[in-house]
Amino acid sequence: MIYRRLFSKPIVLATLFMFSCSKNSPKTSFDKINYKKPSVSFADFIGSNQCQSCHPDIYEQWKGSTHAMAGGPATPENIIAPFNGNPITLKDAIVYPEKVNSTYQFRITELNGDLRQIVAVEAVVGKGMMYGGGTQTFFGKYDDGTYRFLPFDYSKHEATWFVQLRKDEKWVKIDPQLYLDDLYNWPPHRTLGEIDDISNCQQCHGSQIIAKKIDDVYDVKFTSLSINCESCHGPAKNHATIMSNIVQNVVNEYQTIGIESAVGISTNESLNMCFQCHAVKTPIKNNYLPGENLEEFYSLKLPLLGNENPFSINGRIKTFGYQLNHLFSDCFLSGSMDCTSCHNPHSNDYQDISKNALIGRFDDNQCLSCHVTKTSDIAAHTYHKPESEGSSCIACHMPARQHLAIGTEIKYTRADHTVSIPRPSFDSSQGFESACKQCHADISDQDLQLTVNDWYGTIKPLHPVIANRMKINERTTGADAAKVLLQPNHEHPMGQFANLSYFIKRY
């Protein structure tokens, strides 16, 4: 998700305060390979197929991943929506999703059957693979060179077409009382790639997407609409050339392999690979390419300064967000957890901290490989039967949450990556349904909290940065708030930035 917002000069200057609050990159036990990053251009990227011959095992893992199937051209292999001619009926139009010869298209007619417009589908994003609700979005290619989001989406989980409303940007199922002009993406205006003067979606929906305006047209190019190897590893053209020469004995002396190794990178460097897409960020300049410094192109914290801050005070998503709330997790703040602690970066399957493959997303070894003291008697920790959902680490500490910015009609839940402790009363006070409440909907939050207190006594307190924010009330003066909120000695960059944002906006 991209946040394009202008900030006042005092707010921008105040962010400099946070440099003293930033968490230093943790040291690793590996020495980094001596590799000087070259400048990066689109021509330096060669695509994943070029990696297959030398890395066949890893390529096969990637080929079956959600990244590899994240999008692509409109082909039978990629389309999951029913382009069968069954009508989508609106108040002032009828839309026929259909396949004519090899072309997928939306044929839009007036109610009397007169043709209004035909929009061909050039490409798709998504294949309905996400457990919490998978969707597919469609692009048309326009005469000005842009690829534009079309207004009709498909939910695999709901087995239905849906649209996004113009009035509140919520996702809703097709309703015959809706007009075409009620749809947020009609006429199509959101484009693939970052273009300053029109609504757009950034590089997350493809690999190495570059969009530039040239007079009245746009030059849009990309390596693929899947997430390829170079999205994480950076440009591989030089690497492929060097290694080919070495194999052919063209080069005998020692030299770099032409690509930066991911072995030994810091936790923050590893996270930034994923935060290219799995983060809410504010653009600083356009046309980022993998291999460049992400934070020269995006700020990962400035969205917290906006009026639509997507995070609650302890990091949980309150609108539409991504896994950036990992940075609120104690597993990160007090440990070294990055995305690959749980996710195989090539297959996207699940693994434990030692990189051992797990049987699935709900395998408790994802957590127990670190929290080994809980393994001997899990029921003593959970107060639930060992094989029940109440004894699942994920169910209690990473509950699935609907992204409320898009409403509740179309299921679109994602695991809460703050890895929080269930606190029914606190959770309710912040507008969240606690993990306990998700199963025990008939019990009040107060009674659930009493049960938690009875079982665990005094539970682990909130991080001081979060607890300090809770101390602020309507009578707190600016001077007192500054003492409580602006504490650079604590190590909680996201929480500190959120507190700074609150202080600036209120005081």
Per-segment meaning from a language model:
Residues 200-201:
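Long, basic N-terminal domains or extensions that often function
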Residues 191-195, 331:
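Exposed beta-sheet edge/beta-hairpin loop segments within beta-rich domains
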Residues 47, 186-191, 216-219:
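Second-shell loop/turn segments in exported
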Residues 18-20:
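C-terminal motif of bacterial Sec signal peptides marking the signal peptidase cleavage site
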